[in-house]
Amino acid sequence: MFDILLSYISRSTFITIFVLSWLSIYFILTFSILISKMIYLSSWIYRENKALESLLLGSKNINIPSILRKCIKGNITKEKLDVCISMSEKNATSGLTWLSIIASTSPFIGLFGTVVSILDTFANMGSGNAGLSVIAPAISEALVATGAGIFVAIPAYTFHLLIKRKAYEVINIIKRSADVILFNNKDQI
């Protein structure tokens, strides 16, 4: 397996190696964002659920580390809670832009590598070695870049949707908590 990879790299052009390296970085970044955001959002959802439960049980204050805990110090206003919700939304959705960029550009980056490799193959055809035994392997190797681009784009798009759903879930819990806080403190507002 390792020999096949080394053989492929030794026959590849600079552009193909550059494209595959770029896609490898994208692939690693995709999984890094997934793992970090899923751990972060899952623990955040747990904390916000606990805070919401506490509020629903009649507590006027949030004793659990919640994003709204900072917002209920001093005067409680709807505007102040809305600002906290907006800040939470920004934190919850960070990383989604990168996943979107990776999902949308990876196939094009792979296609670019394929086109350059096929152009190189056609340029070599003019040298006289234009047999099918020479052209077919070169074109099949060129298509590896397109396959790699699609291989990177699919998980990036999938992870984008998964994280977007988790972010929606945490923001929804925070909004419900803000509603309960406003209701519990309506006499102060």
Please provide the spans of the model-predicted regions.
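Short leucine-rich amphipathic alpha-helical surface patches
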Residues: 123-126, 143, 147
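Transmembrane alpha-helix/interfacial motif
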Residues: 9-50
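Hydrophobic alpha-helical transmembrane segments of polytopic membrane proteins
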Residues: 144-158
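Residue-level signature of catalytic and energy-coupling elements of molecular machines
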Residues: 31, 107-110, 139, 149
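Alpha-helical membrane-interface segments at transmembrane helix boundaries
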Residues: 6-13, 89-103, 133-144
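Predominantly long cytosolic amphipathic alpha-helical stalk/bundle segments
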Residues: 33, 39-131, 158-189
